[in-house]
Regions:
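Secondary-structure transition/capping motifs at alpha-helix termini
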Residues: 262-265, 317-318, 330-333, 428-433, ...
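Active-site-adjacent structural elements in folded domains
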Residues: 215-222, 238-239, 260, 291-297, ...
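Aromatic- and Gly/Pro-enriched helix-to-coil junctions and flexible linker segments
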Residues: 21-214, 237-238, 242-245, 249-254, ...
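Positively charged n-region of N-terminal signal peptides that target proteins for export
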Residues: 1-5
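Bacterial N-terminal signal peptides
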Residues: 8-19
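Extended surface/linker regions that mediate inter-domain or inter-protein docking
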Residues: 111, 133-136, 141, 147-151, ...
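Alpha-helical scaffolds flanking conserved acidic
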Residues: 226-227, 231, 266-274, 300-306, ...
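Sequence context surrounding c-type heme c attachment/ligation sites in exported
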Residues: 21-81, 88, 95-102, 239, ...
Length: 639
């Protein structure tokens, strides 16, 4: 009966939501300042429908079905992608062929921006904080939580129980996304082994941690049962990260009492009571309870849930005592208190987790572990140099947090981090010792920002040469958030056509020949120019002015015909697409914080954070505060 009621309630909620959206769209249609049929549809018919219409739907887009505001409302994600393609010049792919002028581009972009913003702010659907997700602790979060819960110095679930993350950091997903996670019987057994190992360290090898955790002991005034109640109440509060359930506490006390009746002492009995907690759903998952009285309406998460969201976002671990105390007092959600906690948590060394878990995944830094360049071809690329290269982007990103710098430093900066070996590889004098340190840069070194870092350049190279396509794709994927579609099945085939008069003279000509294939041309026009701009860096990331005795060809040409040269020209191109980069950083950070892919209902939150960054010099703390203060972070709805 309850299941049927839930289905009926959900169906009614969908109908009500659709009706509300319909009404909003109809109202928007009445006072639409840029009429769709006059300003947008004629341009789409002439320049877009040929590839994105009823007969052909490239990228799965069919504009022929979107002939009014109601249909537009249901395809907001498509319009967002269209706006980005127009802004970047990626679409139309051949503007000259279709007579698509700059005025046409501006008119269509103006219409898309106005419609997206107008519809977004009027539609009640944008009050939706997004679907609730059930998030399992990642291996890193599990390790950190065990350490903080049991007051240990360190713990490694991989060695203790064989636990690894359910998703791969090298993939396009963060390991903490709910959709990438699962829990089966084998993993439960591994968690049980890891929990036993952690309790073994606590009770047998760490007297200081044990003393802190066992806050009560039996004596003449306190019975073993009463002392256990004190210890287990606090332990359960911190382990489950929510208010203590009396029935669960009684179950643990029952385990304790059974153990003492069987002859166990106080500490062995406490250990037996703690054991099931470490494999409980409330420990392994971040559980947020639905509120039946809320119906389909969004509601603020409670202070316990907010503390958990905040600490796992910024520390990849459980709340500390201060967060628990504020949550218990019902004060954490007060704006001034929450703002102060954001500053405190960001300043804590544990916030390095943002670098280790967010930045490492977003930037695909794990690719460096299997970077292809060979030391036989590039003798300077020693193991120690590779290690320094790995550290550079991580230290750089963490410095943005520690010094609250502009996130635009990721595109270009007058400093980096290097030790003596890496500085020598870069041609930077005056750096000594094996320790990584902050180093000032000048233009003559051709570094600054992510694009000048050896790690990024080496991990996007072949064994014996550069790989412009991989470098260009990394820029589109990671920096701009506009990944090209997967290549066709024969994309790796570089064989020249039979009618080609002469073989290509160099790799650039070979790639150009390959890109001339109709199935490859559109993507390579976007990808290759960006990669060729980095040709002054060899396969290992060292600067060079010539290749095989000839000057390096580092000229790129964008789809709209604009030429640029070298890494400095590329940085200028990225500067012109700065808002797209900022929006992508915000999108990536929100995805990581929420544990789910964003949807079009999150667009307003993203736009508000982008606007806040513009007003505050793009400071790192403004990005984090914007995410935490956003509606999707502070609110939830029933599943």
């Amino acid at each position: 009966m309850r299941a049927n009621s839930c289905i009926i309630a959900a169906f009614c909620a969908i109908i009500l939501m659709a009706a509300a959206c319909s009404a909003a769209a109809e109202k928007a249609a009445q006072d639409d300042p840029l009429l769709f049929k006059q300003d947008a549809w004629p341009l789409l018919q002439v320049h877009c429908v040929r590839c994105h219409g009823a007969k052909k739907q490239k990228m799965g887009v069919d504009f022929s079905t979107m002939t009014g505001l109601l249909s537009i409302l249901g395809h907001r994600d498509v319009w967002r992608r269209a706006r980005e393609a127009l802004e970047s010049g990626d679409m139309p792919p051949d503007p000259e062929e279709t007579s698509f002028t700059d005025a046409d581009r501006k008119r269509l972009m103006d219409w898309v921006r106005d419609r997206v913003e107008t519809i977004d702010r009027r539609s009640p659907i944008y009050l939706d904080p997004g679907p609730p997700v059930l998030r399992q602790l990642t291996r890193v979060e599990y390790n950190n939580t065990i350490v903080d819960l049991l007051r240990l110095d360190r713990f490694d679930a991989a060695s203790a129980g064989g636990i690894v993350d359910p998703s791969n950091f090298v993939s396009e997903h963060f390991a903490n996304l709910a959709a990438a996670q699962s829990l089966d019987q084998t993993l439960v057994e591994k968690y049980l082994a890891a929990g036993d190992a952690a309790l073994d360290v606590l009770f047998n090898r760490n007297a200081k941690a044990r003393s802190a955790l066992l806050s009560a002991h039996p004596d003449n005034q306190t019975s073993p049962h009463d002392a256990a109640r004190v210890v287990l109440t606090r332990f359960l509060r911190r382990a489950h990260r929510q208010q203590v359930d009396g029935d669960e506490l009684d179950e643990l006390l029952g385990i304790f009492d059974d153990a003492t009746r069987a002859g166990d002492g106080f500490e062995p009995a406490i250990r037996k009571a703690m054991r099931p907690v470490l494999v409980s759903a409330a420990f392994l998952y971040r559980i947020e309870e639905d509120r039946p009285d809320a119906g389909s309406d969004a509601y603020k998460v409670n202070d316990d849930e907010l503390a958990v969201r905040l600490s796992y976002f910024l520390w990849s671990s459980m709340p500390d005592d201060e967060l628990f105390a504020l949550a218990d007092a019902g004060r954490l959600s007060q704006p001034d208190v929450l703002d102060a906690q954001i500053k405190r948590i960001l300043a804590d060394p544990r916030a390095r987790a943002l670098t280790d878990n967010f930045a490492a995944s977003w930037l695909r830094l794990a690719m460096m572990n299997r970077a292809l360049p060979s030391q036989d071809v590039f003798p300077a690329l020693t193991r120690s140099l590779k290690d320094a290269m790995r550290q550079e982007p991580a230290l750089f990103f963490d410095n943005l947090r520690a010094e609250d710098r502009s996130i635009l430093d990721l595109l270009d900066a007058d400093y980096t981090f290097a030790n003596e070996e890496l500085a020598r590889f870069y041609g930077i004098p005056g750096v000594s010792g094996p320790k990584m340190q902050k180093v000032a840069l000048s233009p003559q070194f051709h570094r600054g920002g992510l694009l000048g870092m050896g790690c990024i350049l080496a991990m996007t190279s072949h064994t014996d040469r550069t790989k412009p396509t991989a470098r260009g794709k990394w820029i589109l994927d990671v920096l701009l958030g506009t990944p090209p579609p997967p290549p066709p099945a024969n994309a790796g085939n570089f064989a020249a056509p039979n009618n080609h008069a002469a073989p290509p003279k160099n790799f650039r000509e070979k790639l150009a020949l390959h890109a001339s294939d109709a199935s490859c041309a559109a993507c390579h026009k976007r990808i290759d120019p960006l990669g060729f701009a980095l040709e002054n860096y060899d396969g290992a990331g060292a600067w060079r002015d010539s290749d095989a005795g000839k000057p390096v060809d580092n000229v790129g040409r964008l789809p709209r015909g604009k030429e640029f040269q070298g890494v400095e020209g590329l940085k200028q191109v990225l500067h012109e697409r700065q808002e797209q980069f900022i929006r992508n950083v915000v999108t990536q950070m929100m995805t990581y914080a929420l544990g789910r892919q964003l949807q079009y209902t999150d667009d307003l939150a993203v736009a508000d954070i982008v606007d806040a960054l513009k007003r505050d010099d793009y400071r790192f703390s403004t990005l984090i505060r914007g995410v935490v203060m956003s509606r999707p972070f502070l609110y939830r709805r029933n599943g």
